[in-house]
Amino acid sequence: MHVNSIEAFLDALRQELEVPDHRYEQAERSYTSLANWLHRDGSTVSRYDPQVYCQGSFRLGTAIRPHTEAEEYDVDSVVELRLLTKREKTQYQLKLMLGAEIHAYHDAMDMLKPVREGNRCWILDYADGAQFHMDIVPAVPNHNQHYMLLNSLSLDTRWASTAISITDRREPNYKLLTDTWPRSNPKGYASWFASRQAIVFERRLLIATEN
């Protein structure tokens, strides 16, 4: 009885905090729209094959509902220019180049709130009714360098193929042409997270079966 009460409480809490499906759909429409813009005729970045995808809690499915209507969902996303390398541009140049496209997208979509710049990203604030903003991190592939690093440390390389390098204006080499950029791997982390969740699910299923 006690266990059932706890499970009922946790289920009620989950439903209270859970993000509605239409919010996920809204976020997906937003970064799909941005991806289409970056691939349009006349885009200054289309030749680099930009890929837009979400990261963080929205990718993991762990986002929680804001406490009040005044608070917003933070949709973290990445724009990975898959045919661009760190040998061609600095972090600063990449961020400026993508920023120009994001400003143009903002104007073309008649968005009212101005584009903001974060340390690692550009930020698009959507209309008040949408109740979310999108952080857009510029990135380039980093799978080879990341694989070699993990391999040299005898660490798991299963998810190295999706590693990226990102921009951060706080870095001392932000305006220098160098291979030393901040590293990230949101796709790899999501895959690792899913694998851990699968293990937890299997354990719970086994316990439920035994009981």
Predicted regions, residues:
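Non-catalytic N-terminal regions of enzymes
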Residues: E71-Y73, S77, D110-V115
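Generic detector of well-ordered alpha-helical segments enriched in charged/polar residues
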Residues: E7-R14, E25-E28, T32-A35, K95, ...
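Long, well-ordered hydrophobic secondary-structure segments characteristic of membrane-embedded
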Residues: V78-R82
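Long, charge-rich alpha-helical interaction segments
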Residues: S165-N211
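Residue-level detector of short, conserved catalytic/binding motifs and their immediate flanks
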Residues: P50, V75, W122
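Conserved catalytic core of two-metal-ion nucleotidyltransferases
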Residues: L38-G42, L60, Y92-D156, A163-S184
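N-terminal regions immediately upstream of nucleotidyltransferase
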Residues: M1-E72, L83-Q93
